[in-house]
Amino acid sequence: MENKILGLHHITAIADNAKRNLDFYTKVLGVRLVKKTVNFDDPGTYHFYFGNEQGEPGTILTFFPWEGIGKGTAGAGMATHIGYAVPQGSLDFWKNRLGEHQISLQESEIFGEKLISFNDPDGLQLQFIETKDDRKTWTTTDINSEHALKGFHNITLSLKEADPTLKVLTDILGYSLQQQHDNRYRLTTDSIDTANIVDIIADKNLPYGKNAAGTNHHVAFRVKDDNVLMEYREKVLSAGLDITPKIDRDYFFSLYFREPGGVLFEIATDNPGFTVDEPLSSLGSALKLPKQYESYRSQIEQTLPKID
């Protein structure tokens, strides 16, 4: 299994106000700020990584909070719904908690799984699904391990047509189609038990989305190490798709390619991980800069928006 895609690695989205984004995910949803750094291409913008206690792949939701970018529109060619696994029996807790924060939600069932759906402050669509999941959580004073988010359950891609993307997911990334109901498809990989589901909604009449606050930027799939990463680069190239060279993102190595439906896919390694520059006990507590920006730390710190 080590040379396979190991489900989701991380998901990256766009926000507007940095403090509002940080407060919502750490204080309302109770996930850990695993890393506080900056955008590699725009060091005046934060890059927040939220996850579980260990910052494990499959739990990491990251954000570029571009202040003043305005609201985006979810639509075709995007990952439109991010599904989190929550402990069995915890949905009532979350319904009450979200209600206390004046967050409206909808209850539904997809492929036999009960879930709640709601939006974050920028409009990003989140779903909480009750499921058996043994991953360790990050707990807070008011969210204990019986209720805390476990990490990703699934990601939903919205597309004009399903077949070209299904081919990439099955032929290149090793997923298999498990269920289909009308225009909704569910794919899984048996290489891992968690964060291993990709759903597709296909609708030829769905307008294309507009990338800005409240929308997904890219979806990253997980591999063990650099050797496996480069094997997948060859697979993507052999399928006739363009893909980047290997990129060092400090906490993982990455490749990027755009699948035929328009979604930006990344493949990212487990190594070296988030403890490469700070200990587990203090993850996310200090501003960490890519080495090319360290000599500009004072200017960057003055430029970044206030979040304390």
Regions found by a protein language model. Give the residues of each.
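Conserved donor-binding loop and adjoining core beta-sheet/short helix segment
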Residues: 35-38, 50-83
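Short amphipathic alpha-helices in soluble, non-transmembrane regions
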Residues: 27, 64, 97-98, 170-171, ...
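Short, flexible, solvent-exposed loop/turn segments with mixed acidic/basic and small polar residues
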Residues: 1-2, 71-73, 142-147, 207-210
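Short amphipathic beta-strand starts and helix->beta connectors
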Residues: 64-68, 138-141, 201-206
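Surface-exposed interaction/gating patches
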Residues: 146-233, 237-243
